[in-house]
Amino acid sequence: MEIMRMNADHVASVAAIEKECFGRDAWSEKSVSGELTNALALWLVAVEGGTVAGYVGSQTVCNETDMMNVAVTADFRRQGIGEKLVTALVEELKAIESHSLTLEVRASNTPAQALYEKLGFTEVGRRPRYYQNPKEDALILRKEF
């Protein structure tokens, strides 16, 4: 598996994973493509045998980064790809002198919360009813570096 910066060749696959994982809340292919020209954005993909297995997207403003999306397609889950993507993102962010990475996660998504805790994230807040379908709170997690 290789982790690299997303390019135009990856956009359709990333959009398909978005739809698979997030349904009607998914980013469109046009929105994903727009991130290629967003100077604040950094998106990485995990590629296995020519197939995009997963991705992570972020946006950095004033040395603080928000993780926008992370997802792994069903065929590649439970193989540590999400962990590798977030770890690679943190390393890339350190190189551009970002000081922190913040994300939101569903309060019910305990597997993701366990991964983020393992990677050194701590809970810093809660956004009531942040998610729709179903309505649910988001936990705000942050990692300083």
Positions of the model-derived regions?
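Conserved catalytic-core motifs of GNAT/GCN5-like acyltransferases
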Residues: E104, E117, T122-A138
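Short glycine/proline-centered loop/turn elements that form peptide/ligand docking sites
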Residues: V86, N109-A112, R129-P134
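Conserved acetyl-CoA-binding loop-helix of GNAT-fold acetyltransferases
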Residues: R78-E92, A114-K118
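Terminal substrate-recognition subdomain of acyl/acetyltransferases
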Residues: D137-F145
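Acetyl-CoA-dependent GNAT
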Residues: E2-D75, V86-A88, E92, I96, ...
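Residue-level recognition of the GNAT/N-acetyltransferase active site
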Residues: N7, T73, R77, E104-S108, ...
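Conserved hydrophobic beta-strand within the GNAT/NAT acetyltransferase core sheet
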Residues: M67, L101-V105
